Amino acid sequence: MKRPFLTLFSALVLASALVPTTYAAVDLDNPSVKLSPDQIPSAVERLIREKKFDTALEYINEGLEQNPISAQLKFQKSVLYEAEGWPDLAQKELESFIKTFPEIPEAYNNLARYASNRGDYKRAEELLTQALALRPGYTTARENLANVYLAEAAQALKVAAKGGSRSAARRLTALEELLKD
């Protein structure tokens, strides 16, 4: 009676060994060529641009299996989640990224956008200030910080305008026009 079980078990083991691995990151233009770990980020970038999100995530995961400390792939994962329309996952990924790679300013800049979108301008300011401390010449972070200051000014002007200040109302109108860009 044990023999049929062993035969079945042996057959299953053999069958699973014959099934190819579930995924292999391959060259997008030449699928017969497997990508090396340092080629995967470029392929992921292209896949995200082409909106092939499932394949991009598979490439990221495979790349992280080969190189678990790849800052580029971990960052791309947050970019992928944002592109896919999963901002909560993107934000979690960025928070995790900052804990692992606190020296990379782009993560602070991207995370600040989420804080700003929630209206948490103080947190956005903290994150952007950190990005600028890491790289003082980071123009995008500086511009985003200026936008945070403008949004805070708009909030203050709204309160003043509701209180009856005509000059605050005029400034608010001008500022809102400026913020449309």
What spans do the regions from the language model cover?
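Alpha-helical segment of the N-proximal tetratricopeptide repeat
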Residues: 38-69, 79, 83
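Conserved structural position within tetratricopeptide repeats
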Residues: 64-65, 95-99, 129-133, 162
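Helix-start (N-cap) detector for alpha-helical repeat units in TPR-like alpha-solenoids
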Residues: 36-37, 71-72, 105-106, 139-140, ...
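Structural signature of tandem alpha-helical TPR/SEL1-like repeats
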Residues: 50-58, 83-96, 118-130, 149-159
